[in-house]
């Protein structure tokens, strides 16, 4: 399922990142790597605040829709 469908407070794992090479590289540099455990902290003004490797990262809904996740 896309990250945009994950519930706030849920812990999930990154499964696949879709998009162009530069998009995938950008998200990987933020810590979104296959198998990484992440959690949705909150949604503010259409952006998702995600906990990735003990760091909070804000991503747009458009960018989050490219990140496929699976349940923890």
Positions of PLM-derived features:
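Short alpha-helix capping/helix-loop boundary micro-motifs
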Residues: 22-26
């Amino acid at each position: 399922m896309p990250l945009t469908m994950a519930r706030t407070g849920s812990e999930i794992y990154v499964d696949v990142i879709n998009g162009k090479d530069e998009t995938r590289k950008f998200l990987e540099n933020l810590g979104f790597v296959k198998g990484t455990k992440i959690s949705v902290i909150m949604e503010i003004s259409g952006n998702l605040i995600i906990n990735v490797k003990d760091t909070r990262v804000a991503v747009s809904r458009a960018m989050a829709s490219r990140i496929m996740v699976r349940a923890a």
